[in-house]
Design a protein with these regions (language model features):
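Glycine-rich phosphate-binding P-loop
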Residues: 4-21
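Conserved small/polar residues in nucleotide/adenosyl-binding loops
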Residues: 115-122
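Structural recognition of the conserved hydrophobic beta-strand(s) that form the central parallel beta-sheet
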Residues: 84-89
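Post-Walker A helix-loop "phosphate-sensing" segment adjacent to the P-loop in P-loop NTPases
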Residues: 23-31
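Short, high-confidence coil segments that cap the C-terminus of an alpha-helix
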Residues: 1, 27, 81-82
Length: 122
């Protein structure tokens, strides 16, 4: 499996630009905030954005929960995923996610340096 990571600070537009990055790199699946997504459809996982606290949100996004990990691992196997884009705020976070869901090491990091109007608020 080819594993890529899109990394950048909060508010840099990672989620917004992920579809373009995936298309440009022939990537069919994306891990974003605890979800495995393909063609804008949720395949597996639970959204970190629905967690009640920032700590819970981060834990969800990095797949700290074994049941959450196993659900996404199973989907990766069942769908025979050949390429995956992991979205994270840092290389360290992306590597933690890759390790938690049991995928190959990340072979390419793509950096999101674009700032949206929300970035100024962070």
């Amino acid at each position: 499996m080819k594993v890529y990571a899109l990394v950048g600070k909060s508010g840099t537009g990672k989620s917004h630009h992920s579809m373009w990055v995936a298309r440009e790199n022939n990537i069919d699946y994306i891990i974003d905030d605890g979800l495995l997504v393909s063609d804008n459809q949720i395949i597996a996982g639970k959204s970190a954005k629905r967690e009640p606290t920032k700590v819970a949100s981060v834990r969800r996004a990095i797949f700290s929960d074994k049941i959450h990990q196993d659900e996404v691992k199973k989907a990766i196997t069942d769908y025979n995923i050949q390429s995956l884009l992991i979205i994270g705020t840092s290389e360290r976070m992306a590597n933690k996610i890759a390790d938690a869901i049991g995928v190959s090491p990340i072979e390419k990091f793509i950096y999101c340096l674009l700032y949206t109007s929300d970035a100024a608020d962070d």
